[in-house]
Amino acid sequence: MEIILYANLGALPHFNPDLDGDTPPPTVLELRAEVGLAEGLLICSPEYAHGIPGCLKNALDWLVASVEFPGKAVALLNTSARAIHAQAQLTEILTTMSARLIPEASVTLALPNQSADGAGLALDPEFSRTLRSALLALAQAIER
């Protein structure tokens, strides 16, 4: 499985349906193209003030009317056991958008400590086991 990080959430313009005509902004076209090429999506979001960050909601708003998103296999990764509101909001939003949520691939991965980097997280057996299981479930769902 190849995982490609989409790192341009902040470059997307604020959603405006008037701009979503025949020629949407280039960054929106790029987002839609990347989503279209993906066999599945892995969404990991922090929780701010009991909700998802505005930049993530903005990106999802740009995907609502796109043909690339409906039916896409989606796994949700929650990195805080206490962050239940963002996870619930994402589930509601993505269901409304006709995503194919994969419950067995949607897990809570409590970060062992704030200073852990990718290498440190990989050394944590529980974290690695849970992440590996979620990715395997997503891969299996994509193959179905």
Sequence positions of predicted segments:
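A glycine- and small-aliphatic-rich helix-loop capping segment at beta-alpha/alpha-beta transitions
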Residues: 58-66, 92-97
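Short, conserved catalytic or interaction motifs in soluble domains
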Residues: 17, 65, 79
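Short, glycine-/small-residue-rich phosphate/pyrophosphate-handling segment
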Residues: 72-111, 125-129
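Glycine-rich nucleotide phosphate-binding loop and flanking beta-alpha elements
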Residues: 49-50, 83
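Short coil/turn connectors at secondary-structure junctions
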Residues: 38, 71-72
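N-terminal beta1-alpha1-beta2 submodule of the flavodoxin-like/Rossmannoid cofactor-binding fold
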Residues: 1-45, 51-61, 121-143
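Mobile beta-alpha loop/short-helix "lid" or hinge segments that flank ligand
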Residues: 3-14, 65-67, 98-118
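Active-site beta-alpha loop architecture of Rossmann-like, nucleotide-cofactor-dependent enzymes
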Residues: 48-49, 115
